[in-house]
């Protein structure tokens, strides 16, 4: 069964990003691409949402106050094992750590073009759909 771009529309994304401007920018871009996005400013704020709603993708910065993105991804896996994880970060060393600790997660390094973000999100969601089938 082939999936087109419209199959991703309304996919539920939880965005955890502590930088207000970046968070707002990402929400606008993802919503414009057709995704439903809930956004929080730290990992600890994401936990109640993960408990109350199913998300297709957790899109998280890695370096955040209170709870970093790697710990958030581990908690997400405990709460909702079928939620895919994708990290965004501006730190190369953090990217290596994330790749070791969350080997199935995609890591996108800042700066990135919004088109690249949307393409990577679609790839991750396509992999999720393929795994379900």
Regions inferred by a protein language model and the residue ranges of each:
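Non-catalytic signal-transmission and effector/linker regions of two-component phosphorelay proteins
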Residues: 1-14, 115-133
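Acidic catalytic/metal-coordinating carboxylates
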Residues: 41-45, 68-72
């Amino acid at each position: 069964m082939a999936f087109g771009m419209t199959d991703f529309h309304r996919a539920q994304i939880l965005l955890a990003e502590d930088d207000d401007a970046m968070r707002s920018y990402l929400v606008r871009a993802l919503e414009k691409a057709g995704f439903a996005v809930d956004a929080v400013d730290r990992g600890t704020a994401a936990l109640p949402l993960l408990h109350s709603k199913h998300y297709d993708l957790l899109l998280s910065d890695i370096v955040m106050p209170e709870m970093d993105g790697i710990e958030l991804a581990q908690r997400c896996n405990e709460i909702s094992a079928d939620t895919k994880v994708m990290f965004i970060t501006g730190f190369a060393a953090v990217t290596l750590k994330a790749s070791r600790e969350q080997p199935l997660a995609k890591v996108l390094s800042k700066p990135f073009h919004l088109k690249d973000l949307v393409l990577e999100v679609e790839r991750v969601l396509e992999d999720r759909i393929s795994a379900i089938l």
